[in-house]
Amino acid sequence: MGRISFVIQDFNELSEEVSKYFIFLQDLEQGKVKLIKEIQGNNKANKIDVELENTLKGSAYLLLYNLIESTMKNAIEAIFQELQEKDVSFDKIRPELKKIILVNLKGRNPDKILEKIQDISLDIVSIGFNKEELFTGNIDSKLIRETAKKYGFDSQTDDKKRTNDKISYLRLIKNNRNDLAHGNRPFGDVGKSKTADELIEIKKTIVEYLKGILENIETYIDNEEYLDSTNTP
């Protein structure tokens, strides 16, 4: 099983965790979830107030954004792990990947690079990748398309009818995540604009989109599309 298979497995597990939270939000909004308070030895059920409900809905955007960013980071990492495991040398990879590696090397310490290099044609590929430099809080549909173009994998997914939804949802998730992360807006303010049902619809659309992107990257790796086609005999 290739590295991308583990990425897909992790994505499915994380998606399931996120789904459970969104179902909880739906139950909460429908009054199926209550707080149990003990008063003088007696338990009393109280409906959760709207402000707390909105705060919890605001947190949903962080879960969605983390799902998107972690999935894309892990998928890109799988490409480089494939190159390392198959000992693919720098001169054999496609020009787009060469550019990425060379740009990444600009910020590296030359002394540390020399410490790690034994075979420059192979080691430069692994040294020229840093997972933590990918998608630092700014991922949306535009960046995913640009990343696909940079690496050479397909950014189109099967569900073309919902392209506008995907674009607007990804932008909404990114903007809300950044507002929350930077303290620009309170969680309750972010959460009050959507119902739980609307959030579930957003989640379903994003999960299906990410599945399609992962399938495209899996095809890219399986078909060795990371190789320079001009080197193919």
Residue map of PLM features:
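Short alpha-helix boundary/capping elements
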Residues: 68-72, 178-181
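Helix-loop junctions and short alpha-helical segments
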Residues: 63-64, 71-161, 166
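Short, charged/polar micro-motifs that form catalytic or ligand-binding hotspots
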Residues: 46, 50-66, 163, 170, ...
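Polyanionic, low-complexity intrinsically disordered segments
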Residues: 2-30, 34, 153-233
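Charge-rich, acidic-biased intrinsically disordered regions
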Residues: 36-44, 83-102, 198-208, 225-233
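Amphipathic alpha-helical interaction segments
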Residues: 29-30, 69, 73, 88, ...
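Charged alpha-helical initiation segments
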Residues: 1-62, 76, 91-93
